[in-house]
């Protein structure tokens, strides 16, 4: 749900703001991946 709204806003905004929001989106994705990895490690333990 969150990713859909972010991509929708990116299309409406200008290239600069779109690039900036794109960077933020990648940061959020990295955090989500880290959370998933941590959960997997806890499950393994």
From Swiss-Prot:
Which Gene Ontology CC terms are recorded? chloroplast; ribonucleoprotein complex; ribosome
Concerning its family, UniProt says: Belongs to the bacterial ribosomal protein bL34 family.
HAMAP family the record matches: Ribosomal_bL34
What Pfam families does the annotation carry? Ribosomal_L34 (PF00468)
Highest taxon above the source species: Eukaryota
GO molecular-function term, one example from the UniProt record: structural constituent of ribosome
- Organism whose genome encodes this protein: Cyanidium caldarium (Red alga)
Query: Could you identify this protein by its name?
Result: Large ribosomal subunit protein bL34c
Keyword Secreted in the entry? The reply is no
Instruction: Offer one example of a GO biological process linked to this entry.
Output: translation
Q: What is the annotated localization of this protein? A: Plastid, Chloroplast
Residue ranges with Basic residues bias: 10-19
Give the source lineage, highest ranks first.
Answer: Eukaryota, Rhodophyta, Bangiophyceae, Cyanidiales, Cyanidiaceae
Q: InterPro entries recorded for this chain?
A: Ribosomal_bL34
Name the predominant localization: plastid
Q: Which UniProt keywords apply?
A: Chloroplast, Plastid, Ribonucleoprotein, Ribosomal protein
> Region entry Disordered: which residue ranges?
1-21
């Amino acid at each position: 749900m969150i990713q859909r709204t972010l991509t929708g806003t990116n299309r409406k905004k200008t290239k600069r703001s779109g690039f900036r929001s794109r960077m933020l989106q990648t940061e959020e994705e990295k955090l989500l991946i880290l959370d998933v990895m941590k959960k997997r490690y806890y499950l393994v333990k």
